[in-house]
Amino acid sequence: MSLFRTIPTPGDFAPLFRLLDDYDNHRSARGHASVQSFAPRFDVRESNEAYHLDGELPGIPQSNIDIEFTDPQTLVIKGRSEREYHSSSDDNKNDQADTENQARGESSEVAKTGEKQVSTKKAANKSRYWVSERSVGEFQRTFTFPTRVNQDDVKASLKDGILSLVVPKAVPPTAKKITIQ
């Protein structure tokens, strides 16, 4: 029997709460597997003349990225990332051998149904993911600038997976005095 009573502190339960949160996040992510989305990371800095945005979009072709202004001070960057894999040389050799065998009529996987021949291809080398850390699916980021910007002179470039934008600030309107005649 203990002489001192131990009172649990909120920090004692932190690992348990983290575990429950991870489980909840995992379950909710599986339910929405049909439409995956993510927000790419951006660095935003301001100079005297412009705003500079640099975002990580690795492996996304330029044709899958849309940049537009939704209002005078709001810029939206959106697009789609797809998972693509290139088969290894062994896979290419197997595919070429299968194609050559089928061309010569040596396919061992032909089933005759009446007068029709139905050839069944081997199931493609289906892979099972052990870890899936790449961001795949739709993405969108919205940036609202605190000052007016010159939409006509925005410059964007995509190099080595980094999308760089230069959004020049608009020249502040000057007061114009009108003389009365």
Curated annotation (Swiss-Prot):
Pfam families given in the database record: HSP20
Residue spans of biased composition, Basic and acidic residues class: 79-115
Domain of life: Eukaryota
GO biological process: cellular response to farnesol; cellular response to heat
Keyword flag Ubl conjugation: no
Annotated region described as Disordered, given as residue ranges: 79-127
Residue ranges of domain sHSP in the record: 33-181
Keyword terms of this UniProt record: Stress response
ATP-binding in keyword set: no
Family: Belongs to the small heat shock protein (HSP20) family.
Protein name: 30 kDa heat shock protein
Gene designation per UniProt: hsp30
